[in-house]
Amino acid sequence: MPPHPAFTEKQGQYLAFIWAYTQINARPPAERDMQRFFDVTPPSVHQMVLTLQRQGLIRRQPATARSIELLIPPEALPVLRSIQTVKTSEARY
């Protein structure tokens, strides 16, 4: 198996999300889908997409929505973790 570019834990989660979303929905995610899942701002998602593209982990067509394509095999991806913000509230009496 040829070596794959290294990626950080956070980058791996984005890559795993792109793969899982594409498998479930038969189309790549929009940046808005990633924003909702990871609960981050639009600029954060956009910068991550640009970074993944610069590192040769994804390819996309400029000015074409939902055009993200993974350039690494699924076996090289980490398991996608569920991102949940746990909020607790206290009842005040």
Predicted regions and their residues:
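Glycine-centered, phosphate/nucleic-acid-interacting loop/turn motifs that mediate DNA/RNA or nucleotide
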Residues: G56
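Short, cationic-aromatic polyanion-contact patches
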Residues: P5-Q11, A30, Q61-I83
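Short helix-capping/hinge SLiMs at alpha-helix to coil transitions
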Residues: A20-A26
